[in-house]
Amino acid sequence: MILANVFCLFFFLDETLRSLASPSSLQGPELHGWRPPVDCVRANELCAAESNCSSRYRTLRQCLAGRDRNTMLANKECQAALEVLQESPLYDCRCKRGMKKELQCLQIYWSIHLGLTEGEEFYEASPYEPVTSRLSDIFRLASIFSGTGADPVVSAKSNHCLDAAKACNLNDNCKKLRSSYISICNREISPTERCNRRKCHKALRQFFDRVPSEYTYRMLFCSCQDQACAERRRQTILPSCSYEDKEKPNCLDLRGVCRTDHLCRSRLADFHANCRASYQTVTSCPADNYQACLGSYAGMIGFDMTPNYVDSSPTGIVVSPWCSCRGSGNMEEECEKFLRDFTENPCLRNAIQAFGNGTDVNVSPKGPSFQATQAPRVEKTPSLPDDLSDSTSLGTSVITTCTSVQEQGLKANNSKELSMCFTELTTNIIPGSNKVIKPNSGPSRARPSAALTVLSVLMLKLAL
């Protein structure tokens, strides 16, 4: 009887392992056909080397170049070209912010993706690679300037924005590029033209793209206890030249102007992708990544959609592009929605406060704590344990799971209840989604191991 039970257990174990290791369990519908993104410049080179891809790419560009794009895309030849390109590396290609050939990369990206949508979309997918770094990484790099070992009373009274400017002056690259944009943005052209905004924007883009975040973030997102500090923070980008104008344009008109430029369009799409309020995360940010949101916000500075603090309030953080919703007509609701993504964005507000306080998701605050502004939730996601840092939440961590023979509902021998503990390796999370995969793109191996452990102990007990 015992041998029969052992044989049955062996058979059950074999079938369990086969089912867990089968291809159907490895590839769910959400991962089927997924390809890692390729640099669009490189993807274009690969397409050019293949005759079918290159000819179809030329055809699609001709289809999109016409005045009536929708009519052209209805053409069978255009549709065939698009279908071929969707199977090429060009379809999944992405770009890196500040890369050497960024504009060329973005032009290639939009030459494909502008043909995939009908009409104007409110939110567009970001052409940039997902951000994997966290705020805690920035804190570690900036720790030599953070004054974490200083007296809390002295630290609370200090002007953090002034300290950030001093820290920038200690770095040659930061000092050079900051002095450059200050000089250009303060240079008056004529009594009627206070500066050359185009050159000012270019100098600002160079500063935020070329200076490490541990310097730029401290100047842009420094925490303030008084109005003088908050005004210095507001003046960081020289708003009289780079931000303000005689009149505020309509926000939808400003968005339309921005989307005619590949760089501005891409930075705006990236901001929406990384700062759009999420109802399924603890912080209201996509993937609970403050760093991605702050980087996307800084990436818009120096373009038509440049955002800034609206006032010098040290407590209420409100940012906005220089625009309003006056004259929106029947588009007023859409305009207000667009503007609220800046002025009433809980993700962006929490990210700015978190950086100013020196905190990150599930990291103990080094300064005054704040109450995160929560977006209304449809389904609340529980926070991670206090002893689990954000740097490991997207990596590999160890979770110990304990079970027992009786808990499994199985009948054991008359010996004492035997508890079993086994280790599960948590999965990595694909950026921007709740789906999980293993480091080797395989399924979780914890479950077969767990089943093997449980059944082995059962076999041992039955044999005894």
From Swiss-Prot:
GO terms for biological process: cell surface receptor protein tyrosine kinase signaling pathway; glial cell-derived neurotrophic factor receptor signaling pathway; nervous system development. It is found in: Cell membrane. The keyword Signal applies. Residues 1-21 form the signal peptide. Residues 381-392 have a biased composition (Low complexity). The keyword DNA-binding does not apply. InterPro entries: GDNF/GAS1 (IPR016017), GDNF_alpha (IPR037193), GDNF_rcpt (IPR003438), GDNF_rcpt_a2 (IPR003504), Glial_neurotroph_fac_rcpt_a1/2 (IPR017372). Interacts with NRTN ligand and RET: forms a 2:2:2 ternary complex composed of NRTN ligand, GFRA2 and RET receptor. Also forms a 4:4:4 tetrameric complex composed of 4 copies of NRTN ligand, GFRA2 and RET receptor, which prevents endocytosis of RET. Interacts with SORL1. PANTHER family: GDNF FAMILY RECEPTOR ALPHA-2, GDNF RECEPTOR ALPHA. Receptor for neurturin (NRTN), a growth factor that supports the survival of sympathetic neurons. NRTN-binding leads to autophosphorylation and activation of the RET receptor. Also able to mediate GDNF signaling through the RET tyrosine kinase receptor. This is GDNF family receptor alpha-2. It comes from Homo sapiens (Human).
